[in-house]
């Protein structure tokens, strides 16, 4: 057992030694990579920074940070003008220039030596070396260094805000040239030159390799005529984080504090300036941009609903429409909106006038849905002038006069046939050329026995009963009857 314990201990020690060697080799590799390729570390840091959603920290980090830097600059300028500036002569004058004890000429005369010794014993000679002025000298140097850092940071934020956030858009379908300095016209052959912009964004070592090896023609080419052009829009789109940081740490406040005598009353002007700038840019201009985005989204949605979806629904109606009727009735698409008073407005698009027309508020003029029309297609509806037509079949506005005349002719034919039947006469389909339609025939609405009795009492009673039955029960008549 003792030998096994020793073996296990030796095995465990070897594992620990191996882990230490691996950790040391890993650290050596990291230091070697850092020394040989420091730009790779810069790329890694930039990737980590770009992956952070800075807009989420616009209100919680950017605005408090900018206000803190502005207040810090104000306090430093206040101390400089009220604490350092009155003692500027005492802090910057050399004390050795008035040290009479170092003069060999004065030492030759006794009375002058006594005068110089009296100056040395006074407090004015040693005032430059007191702890108070030593502290002021240190604060003066610290204030200068801090102001230099704050000015550099403000200059960087301002340049980043004004010149660092641009995106380029290639507009190939734009035909009209607008009056904008950010919109430029280019040839299609210029697209191959954009390949160099990607090289400039790479590391320094990649750029050197590219330019020392020679330019390779790896960029995209467009085989187009020289006359063909496209527009390029360079749009300025700063992020919310940099906007809030620029507003709270504005260069106008920094310039005002740098070139003016700062006092406690200057704080009122700084607070008023910060509030006005934040109100104009973030609460008015930035929200106006968001409102324009809402309006453009609403206009695009309205165009999609009224134009694109209407065309899609029209094509689907053409595909699903049955061809049994022979012609297709055009049902315009109804769009429902609301007025400012909350009243419902129904509009239909007139393709001839190219505008929307408001429909009357009567419910009879509004066509029903397709499901309602299919459900009630087999029924018969009665209108006010005792006309009958199938429910769900709506005529086109252009064809409505034609069908109205047809229905009127059918009603006249029906009324004339009813009058003749009341007089004792009967009409056979082959004997009358101006007979009514099959669906409106009076013989279709009466049973066979009643028609037979009515026929027997007419002027055609000279025919025998078999001939009458054969005429009434003819195959053609039966076939037409089932076609209904």
Curated annotation (Swiss-Prot):
Composition bias type Polar residues, residue spans: 430-440
Renumbered residue ranges of the record's region Disordered: 416-457
Biological processes per GO annotation: maintenance of rDNA; regulation of exit from mitosis
Chief place where the protein resides: nucleus
Sites bearing Phosphoserine, chain numbering: 3, 417, 474
Keyword Transmembrane: yes
Keywords, comma-separated and alphabetical: Membrane, Nucleus, Phosphoprotein, Transmembrane, Transmembrane helix
Family as reported in the entry's similarity comment: Belongs to the NUR1 family.
PANTHER family documented for this protein: NUCLEAR RIM PROTEIN 1
Function: Member of a perinuclear network that controls recombination at multiple loci to maintain genome stability. Required for rDNA repeat stability.
Protein name: Nuclear rim protein 1
């Amino acid at each position: 057992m003792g030998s096994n314990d020793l073996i296990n201990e030796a095995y465990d020690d070897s594992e620990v030694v191996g882990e230490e060697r691996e950790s040391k080799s890993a650290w050596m590799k990291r230091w070697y990579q850092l020394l040989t390729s420091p730009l790779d570390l810069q790329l890694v840091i930039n990737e980590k920074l770009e992956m952070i959603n800075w807009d989420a920290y616009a209100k919680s980090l950017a605005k408090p940070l900018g206000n803190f830097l502005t207040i810090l600059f104000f306090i430093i300028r206040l101390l400089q003008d009220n604490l350092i500036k009155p003692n500027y002569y005492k802090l910057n004058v050399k004390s050795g220039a008035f040290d009479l004890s170092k003069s060999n000429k004065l030492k030759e005369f006794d009375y002058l030596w006594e005068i110089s010794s009296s100056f040395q014993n006074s407090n004015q000679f040693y005032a430059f070396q007191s702890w108070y002025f030593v502290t002021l000298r240190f604060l003066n140097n610290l204030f200068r260094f801090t102001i230099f850092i704050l000015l550099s940071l403000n200059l960087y934020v301002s340049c980043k805000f004004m010149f660092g956030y641009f995106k380029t858009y290639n507009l190939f379908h734009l035909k009209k040239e607008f009056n904008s300095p950010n919109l430029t016209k280019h040839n299609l052959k210029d697209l191959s030159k954009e390949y160099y912009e990607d090289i400039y964004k790479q590391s320094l070592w990649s750029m050197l390799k590219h330019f020392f090896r020679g330019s390779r023609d790896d960029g995209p080419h467009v085989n187009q005529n020289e006359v063909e052009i496209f527009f390029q829009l360079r749009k300025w789109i700063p992020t919310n984080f940099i906007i809030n940081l620029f507003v709270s740490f504005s260069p106008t406040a920094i310039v005002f504090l740098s070139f003016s005598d700062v006092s406690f009353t200057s704080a009122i002007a700084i607070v008023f300036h910060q509030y006005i700038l934040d109100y104009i840019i973030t609460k008015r201009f930035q929200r106006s941009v968001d409102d324009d985005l809402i309006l453009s989204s609403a206009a695009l949605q309205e165009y999609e609903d009224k134009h694109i979806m209407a065309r899609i629904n029209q094509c689907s109606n053409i595909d699903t429409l049955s061809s049994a009727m022979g012609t297709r009735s055009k049902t315009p698409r109804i769009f429902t909106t609301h007025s400012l008073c909350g009243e419902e407005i129904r509009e239909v698009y007139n393709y001839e006038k190219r505008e929307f027309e408001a429909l009357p508020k009567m419910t009879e003029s509004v066509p029903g849905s397709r499901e309602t029309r299919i459900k009630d297609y087999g029924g018969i509806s009665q209108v006010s002038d005792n006309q009958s037509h199938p429910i769900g079949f709506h005529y086109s506005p252009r064809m409505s006069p034609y069908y109205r005349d047809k229905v009127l002719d059918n009603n006249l034919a029906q009324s004339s046939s009813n009058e003749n039947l009341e007089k004792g006469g009967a009409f056979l389909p082959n004997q009358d050329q101006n007979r009514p339609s099959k669906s409106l025939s009076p013989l279709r609405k009466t049973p066979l026995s009643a028609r037979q009795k009515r026929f027997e009492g007419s002027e055609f009673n000279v025919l025998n009963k078999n001939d009458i039955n054969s005429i009434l029960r003819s195959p053609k008549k039966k076939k037409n009857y089932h076609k209904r």
